[in-house]
Amino acid sequence: MASKGKKPLRRTTTRRRKRSHFKNPSPPCSINSDVTSTSSTSTSPTSTATPSPVSAESGCCTPEKSRIPEMLTCPPAPKKQKVAQNCALRRRQIAFFAPPDVELFFVFALGQQNNK
């Protein structure tokens, strides 16, 4: 009799997504380019007096000064932070607690206690 174990699962192949987070270069705005090109090549006064309609395919464009500048290079990778030096290892003794001073303190404290 054949074993009734589970069949191994097949992994589906995954497609890589297109890199959509990069900006597509857009052509520069040329809203009035049709008007200036027809008026400069034409010599009749009637064509310059009537402006040609703006084509609907050009749509709206953001002014050049208001656009977000494109990054030409990637910013540098973040640097690893330096490990803080362990202060306990480098701690030096405080000069106030030098052995002669400590002994004098206790002698003075014991003398005050005996006088009471």
Swiss-Prot record:
Residue ranges, compositional bias (Basic residues): 1-22
Region of interest (Disordered), residue spans: 1-62
Gene name tied to this protein: SMR9
Keyword Lipid metabolism listed: no
GO molecular function: protein kinase inhibitor activity
The organism's taxonomic lineage, starting at the top: Eukaryota, Viridiplantae, Streptophyta, Embryophyta, Tracheophyta
Keywords in alphabetical order: Cell cycle, Protein kinase inhibitor
Protein name: Cyclin-dependent protein kinase inhibitor SMR9
Bias (Low complexity): 35-56
Alphabetical GO biological process terms: regulation of DNA endoreduplication
Physiological role: Probable cyclin-dependent protein kinase (CDK) inhibitor that functions as a repressor of mitosis in the endoreduplication cell cycle.
Entry superkingdom: Eukaryota
